[in-house]
Amino acid sequence: MISDNVKKGVIRSPNRALLKACGYSDEDMEKPFIGVVNSFTEVVPGHIHLKTLSDAVKHGVYANGGTPFEFNTIGICDGIAMGHEGMKYSLPSREIIADAVESMARAHGFDGLVLIPTCDKIVPGMIMGALRLNIPFIVVTGGPMLPGEFQGKKCELISLFEGVGEYQVGKITEEELKSIEECACPGAGSCAGLYTANSMACLTEALGLSLPMCATIHAVDAQKVRIAKKTGSKIVDLVKEDVKPTDILTKEAFENAILVDLALGGSTNTTLHIPAIANEIENKFITLDDFDRLSDEVPHIASIKPGGEHYMIDLHNAGGIPAVLKVLKEKIRNTKTVDGRSTLEIAESVKYVNYDVIRKVEAPVHETAGLRVLKGNLAPNGCVVKIGAVDPKMHKHEGPAKVYNSEDEAIAAILGGKIVEGDVVVIRHEGPSGGPGMREMLSPTSAICGMGLDDSVALITDGRFSGGSRGPCIGHVSPEAAAGGLIAAIENGDIIKIDMIEKEINVDLDESVIKERLSKLEEFEPKIKKGYLSRYSRLVSSADEGAVLK
């Protein structure tokens, strides 16, 4: 066992003494050491309940002959960080979390890990760190939040972001907005739709890294405690059997996750996180081109918020990810999972699917997959749109650019009534390096939706979008403005042509004009000169490469 390097032999007497100071016995030190990686915090609703889950995991570890050691990582709530400088730290926190997991596990000689994340960057961050070690691990995601209810209608966090736009144009009163605020988020869990946190939980299960149904069991459901306990027991088996993550995370496993993502219409942020996770196995193991290629294999089969009518509770009751695998059985690759059964064995074990929620492939919500990769002179390395949450009339759009050099400039213009039907809002200098941190543009997109412009106005950015964004929102434009991408040279009034069906995005300019404008661009000057974001800005790769640190 790896932990023998910490605890075995006369030379390790000082090490054992320190462990005994923590309350561990000689008997405990004979067992496999299991790190229980928690991300409990009192400021993030997706994480406020994780102490209960970590206790359940530890019970499972003890019951099956292991010794658990709990430690914590940071966890940022994108919703609380949204719309201000704090959002610049969200994506970069993924790398801190990965480094923390790697450092703690290696320093203390853990034989296996159970990861307990919930929200957006914590899920991929923990997995990335654990993959660097290539020791057995299982993920217990914290689970979705239940939707709230206002005046007989379900609501959740995005109802409020869009409510701000509705208030600005007089659709609702401030009192009504306040009333929605009181009931939209009723308790623990990740936001109630198929936003980034829940998308990543679903893909983690599809990768084979969580036990079946884990992704969709809700935070307040006792089933979540039971599956946490079962996971604690299972990790001891994986350590004894030496089942490494690289035995599970083959190219085909990643393809399964991407197929599930495309079929469900998950968050565009998955196109950052899946390549970043795969990068820990091999550079460019998975790229945007894989999303593009696989998007032709499956249709969009689930109508889940923000692009549809259902919530995560509906997906769970419809059969969860195993039911999605069953529906996609003809496309799914047969891969290993931490459960011990193969992906197809899990799919074949499903006895019930609600086909009103998870549609059959031959009767989909949309014929096209839920995510689309676009390329053209504006984004030669690619950009991403959640086409499953776009009004079909906006699948093709041509309009004049309204250009803003930050999210703050753009939101002021949108709320100030400066955007009209037909416009293409361009927000630049918000990329991984230029932002820095690639802020999510949920406030601008929600304002556009709330004001009723989402069927006539497109938004393009080198930043990214919340999983809760809907409408014609095209993000991750690569190269970004800070890297000299064409988005840096667009001017007000330039005509931008978008064709989501043909996967194209271009600005209507002669090549000679493009070259002249690019030649006049000033050299990028980092906005932040000290601290973590200064280092991040210098070291981060492009969005099309997963925004990983070089």
From Swiss-Prot:
Manner of cofactor binding, per the entry note: Binds 1 [2Fe-2S] cluster per subunit. This cluster acts as a Lewis acid cofactor.
| SUPFAM superfamilies in the cross-refs | IlvD/EDD N-terminal domain-like, LeuD/IlvD-like
Signal peptide (UniProt feature, chain positions):
none
Where are residues bearing N6-carboxylysine located in the sequence?
121
- The organism's superkingdom is given as Archaea
Give the matching InterPro entries. Answer: Dihydro-acid_dehy_C, DihydroxyA_deHydtase, DiOHA_6PGluconate_deHydtase_CS, ILV_EDD_C, ILV_EDD_N, IlvD/EDD_N
RNA-binding among keywords: no
Q: Which GO terms describe its cellular component?
A: cytosol
Instruction: Give the residues annotated as active site.
Output: 466 (proton acceptor)
State the needed cofactors, names only: [2Fe-2S] cluster; Mg(2+)
Q: Which GO terms describe its biological process?
A: isoleucine biosynthetic process; L-valine biosynthetic process
Spell out the Gene3D superfamilies in the cross-references: IlvD/EDD C-terminal domain-like
GO molecular function list:
2 iron, 2 sulfur cluster binding; dihydroxy-acid dehydratase activity; magnesium ion binding
**What is the annotated quaternary arrangement, including any partners?**
Homodimer.
Role: Functions in the biosynthesis of branched-chain amino acids. Catalyzes the dehydration of (2R,3R)-2,3-dihydroxy-3-methylpentanoate (2,3-dihydroxy-3-methylvalerate) into 2-oxo-3-methylpentanoate (2-oxo-3-methylvalerate) and of (2R)-2,3-dihydroxy-3-methylbutanoate (2,3-dihydroxyisovalerate) into 2-oxo-3-methylbutanoate (2-oxoisovalerate), the penultimate precursor to L-isoleucine and L-valine, respectively.
Q: Which family does it belong to?
A: Belongs to the IlvD/Edd family.
Checking NCBIfam families in the record gives: ilvD, PRK00911.1
Q: What is this protein called?
A: Dihydroxy-acid dehydratase
Question: What's the source species for this entry?
Answer: Methanococcus maripaludis (strain C5 / ATCC BAA-1333)
**Gene behind this protein:** ilvD
